[in-house]
A protein has these predicted regions:
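Sec-dependent N-terminal signal peptides
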Residues: 2-12
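Cleaved targeting-peptide boundary
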Residues: 12-21
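Hydrophobic alpha-helical membrane segments
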Residues: 21-202
Length: 202
């Protein structure tokens, strides 16, 4: 019952947090709103805690909301998983290496879902995507070894959770864990492709 009340309060709340704009948008489909709902819930926590400040602009949660709204669920969710993997201790170094921009107001790393970066021909995005059959390998090929390590860890943990949930025969837990594993796995393929295509040293 508490979860239902939380969901209703998030849906009916005023647009105080960035993802709320998608929830209240008349142009967003019910499926997009359902996908953005957990992001809106997360923003109610992360935007009120300095420890959870994101190093990127827009933040990972807002990036996810924008990606789902602009690209649809099938592309937006893997894009969000890719961004979560890239939000790691190597992000600042990687951003400098490719001469990325910084947000004037607070110095965060600018990284929008719709990239305005020029495609690089140094690495093959197709090869990076194919190598991602083994999670993390495509990012390593693209020169992002720490992102590759983080991607492998995310896929490993979500897949392990799915296998454990299967052993316990917990339908909800199993469905959720397999969904998360699939999201991060597809995010790895997308992320490796994008890393090889855009995120190369300038």
């Amino acid at each position: 019952m508490r979860i239902l009340l939380l969901i209703i309060s998030i849906i009916l709340a005023q647009s105080k947090y960035p993802a709320d704009s998608v929830l209240t948008s008349p142009n967003a489909t019910i499926i997009e709103k359902a996908a953005v709902l957990p992001i809106a819930g997360w923003q109610r926590l992360s935007h009120n805690t300095r420890l959870l400040d994101c190093q990127f602009y827009p933040s990972c949660s807002q990036y996810g909301a924008i990606a789902i709204k602009e690209k649809g669920i099938l592309k937006g969710i893997p894009m969000t998983a890719d961004r979560i993997v890239r939000c790691n201790p190597s992000a600042f170094f990687n951003h400098l290496h490719m001469r990325g921009g910084f947000h004037d107001a607070d110095g965060r790393l600018i990284d929008h879902p719709t990239s305005h970066l020029i495609a690089s021909k140094k690495k093959s995005p197709i090869v990076a995507g194919i190598l991602s059959i083994f999670p993390g390998a495509g990012r390593v090929y693209a020169g992002r070894w720490f992102d590759g390590f983080m991607g492998f860890v995310m896929v490993y943990f979500t897949a392990s959770s799915a296998i454990d949930a299967s052993k316990r025969d917990n339908y909800f837990g199993k469905s959720f864990a397999y969904s998360m594993a699939a999201i991060f796995y597809t995010g790895e393929i997308y992320g490796a492709y994008r890393s090889a295509k855009y995120y190369q040293p300038q």
